[in-house]
A protein has these predicted regions:
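Long lumenal/extracellular ectodomains of secretory and single-pass membrane proteins
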Residues: 1-311, 321-488
Length: 488
């Protein structure tokens, strides 16, 4: 009886009435499936989800936390990492102290400032001082230094919280404000951070040497103050004669920039920067016979930073354009009804202008997507191998209730309907970009399905190949060599 009560208690519904599960059956997997989609959530909710995972398996939860922050191999989520790190410092300080040296390695040095005014503050400041002293020694010897100087807080900042932190850091380093400021100036000059050049109106720097985030952030400043050199750089980048760094720019940032500036008088300049940056994004496309399915329903416009619909559209375009399989340059957009869209246009902006004419802001009928593919296959007697091998569903997971057998989840219903017609349902990747509620589309051992979350296209390469279950996939990611050093 207890087993059946647990099963019944684990059933819930989406905002649109579809059957769903409260949990996958693993709190760590629940977090793994949503941790990249929590930017719009409160700190209280983020911490609650992590505490459940940490209680279930502390080591795995810590690996998951660093995977979420990992800017090179993971999701690159800053807010959720710092929120959880602050909670850990107050409640599980030993776990933080054990992993202190990995914080900047997987993220940035300023992530450590989340430990200010916690039981881990002393150890954090000692760690920063050691790195600072090593950098100052290398600076005196003419060697290279770390990026610590870039991310340390400035005592002359306009934000009072930053000033407070900077003064604490300076005193921990045994310095007064003036000496600390002078040291930071020297370190930043050695690092050649672009902000120094912009502040001094020094446009002699090499665009090819600038980090991706800075290039994207200051693009309009380059147009205003260094038009000729910047335009020449973009032209060279477009022909492959110059390297434009875009490895840490997310596709949604380009989509949102387009949506925010397309009516501006300076859009012709913005357009050139967007096109060049999009072309320079790293390629995680692959060669699978896979098809992206993006949600543009009304709920995908709830929330900001980023707008979930912008994330979904950017990833759909990115994958369709870069995937070399049989569905190249196509994706399905769904709301009330699915639309199979062929991408048209030469440049990123051309394609985006075209795609925005298809948006249908209504409800979230995922069942109709599965039915579209099945109808086309049955009607034309298409062999199984010509169907998409994988459907990558990018959504907030708030699906409509099924028309038939509404007590079953959308996934269970689709599996049944395909089997009745003599087909196997393609593998499904449920990719969450806005987790507003604690509900999951499948449980942990469901075969042929994977649960992921986030805004980075790196996930496309992670989910390539393999008929996995959600839990197996999570373990493959978190037990990889990259996260081996991390433990509670």
């Amino acid at each position: 009886m207890l087993k059946y009560m647990k099963q019944e208690a684990n059933m819930t519904t989406t905002e649109n009435g579809a059957a769903a599960y409260v949990s996958t059956g693993s709190k760590c997997l629940d977090l793994f499936a949503t941790i990249g989609a929590l930017r719009g959530q409160s700190e209280k909710e983020i911490i609650a989800r992590f505490v459940q995972a940490y209680t279930e398996d502390a080591d795995l939860a810590m690996k998951l936390l660093f995977f979420a922050r990992d800017i090179r191999g993971g999701l690159g989520e800053r807010k959720v990492f710092r929120t959880i790190l602050g909670w850990l410092a107050k409640n599980e300080p030993a776990s933080v102290q054990k992993n202190l040296a990995y914080v900047a390695e997987y993220g940035r040095f300023d992530d450590l400032l989340a430990l200010m005014d916690t039981p881990c503050e002393k150890e954090m400041l000692i760690y920063l001082r050691k790195q600072f002293e090593a950098d100052m020694k290398k600076l005196a010897e003419g060697g290279s230094v770390s990026l610590l100087g870039k991310w340390l807080p400035s005592v002359n900042a306009s934000n009072q919280e930053t000033v407070y932190q900077a003064k604490k850091v300076a005193r921990a380093f045994g310095m007064n404000d003036a000496a600390y400021r002078k040291a930071l100036t020297a370190l930043r000059a050695k690092i050649h951070i672009i902000e120094n050049h912009l502040r001094e109106k020094d446009y002699t720097f090499d665009y090819e040497q600038q980090p991706s985030k800075a290039l994207f952030k200051y693009k309009m400043a380059f147009w205003r103050n260094d038009r000729e050199r910047y335009q020449a750089f973009l032209s060279k980048a477009s022909t492959g004669d110059a390297k434009l760094h875009a490895d840490h720019v997310s596709p949604y940032e380009l989509v949102e920039s387009y949506l925010n500036t397309r009516w501006n008088s300076t859009f012709s300049e913005e357009k050139a920067s967007l096109n060049a940056t999009w072309a320079a994004l790293p390629d995680f496309g692959g060669e699978e016979n896979a098809l992206a399915v993006i949600d543009t329903s009304g709920s995908m416009y709830c929330g900001r930073n980023p707008i979930p619909a912008a994330v979904a559209l950017s990833l759909g375009l990115y994958f369709a354009e870069r995937n070399k399989g049989g569905f190249r340059n196509h994706f399905i957009e769904f709301s009330e009804r699915p639309q199979l869209i062929e991408i048209k246009g030469e440049t990123f902006v051309d394609k985006l202008q075209y795609l925005t004419t298809f948006e249908e802001i209504a409800d979230t009928n995922l069942e109709a997507v599965f039915d579209l593919i099945l109808r086309a296959a049955v009607k034309n007697q298409v062999p199984q191998e010509e169907l998409p091998a994988k459907l990558i569903i990018i959504s907030d997971m708030e699906f409509n209730a099924c028309v038939n057998k509404a007590s079953k989840t959308v996934f269970k219903n689709a599996k049944r309907r395909y089997k009745e017609k003599g087909y196997s349902l393609p593998e499904v990747v449920f990719w969450n970009v806005a987790s507003r509620n604690r509900q999951q589309p499948v449980t942990k051992n469901e075969q042929g399905v994977v649960l992921v979350s986030g805004a980075t296209p790196r996930i496309f390469s992670m989910v390539a190949g393999g008929n996995l279950s959600p839990y197996t996939f999570m373990m493959e990611v978190l037990q990889s060599e990259r996260y081996a050093p991390i433990a509670a």
